[in-house]
Structure formats: C-alpha cells, structure tokens
Amino acid sequence: MSKYICVFCDERKESDTAHLINGKIGICRHCFENLDKTAYASPYQGTEHIAFTMSPFEYTKSMRKVILDLKFSNCKAYAKLLADMMKDYLDSYDIWDTFDYIVPVPLHKKRLKERGYNQSELIAKEVAEYLKIPMRLSLIHI
C-alpha cells in the first residue's frame, strides 16, 4: 500500500486513510473532518464589480499553515489539493452557469518576482478547468 504525508498534520499515512491524495501528499480523513467548514456561501457586499465570493473553510490555524506553506515554502502541489477541496464544495451549488469568469486574487509584482508564482492563480486555474469557466487575470494589485 502506498503512503502519503498529510499536509495538515505532517504525518506519514497509508493511502486508505486519505480524503484526497496528490502524489506523495494528501489530506487524511481525520484532518479533513476536523477542518472548520463554512456553513454556506454568502454574497460579498462590497462593490458592484464583485457579486459573489466563497470559501469552503474558515481560516483557522491548520488552514493557515497549509496556505502559508503554499505561499512561502514553495509547496505548489498544495494548490491542487486546495483546489480539489474547493471542487468538492462547489459541487453542492448549482449556480456556475451564471458566472462569466473565475478571477484569482492578484499578487503584487514584487511578491510574484520573489515567489515565482501566484498561489491564488494556481488554485483558480484548477477550479476554472473543473467548472469549464474561463479564468481571467483582469484584476490589478495596487
């Protein structure tokens, strides 16, 4: 049986304990079940240009660790796992045919140069392909 390392608890696990696996990393069922999930998607009440945002999970200590590893420790493979978690969440909503684009949060040019990638764009690309909605890099970080 193959093994993977859970990105949340950093433990080496047998593949039959996984909620998701991507190569040698994954998310064990125990960690996935203990993530603080949001109750529902709610409209963003900010501007006329952003009608809707959503997040499947609360930004807790464990989620923060994974996101920071993705952003600052060159753990780009984490983006696929986070996107797969987002896909599971999105399947419970039937609103995607009304969306024109998936737009990732822009990264400042300085950060992009330092990091070499935009973690939000990596996740958005996976989600856009899954939903068959074009991804658009139209926001500018100011």
Tell me what each language-model feature is.
Residues 1-140:
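Glycine-rich phosphate/pyrophosphate-handling loop used in enzymes and phosphotransfer proteins
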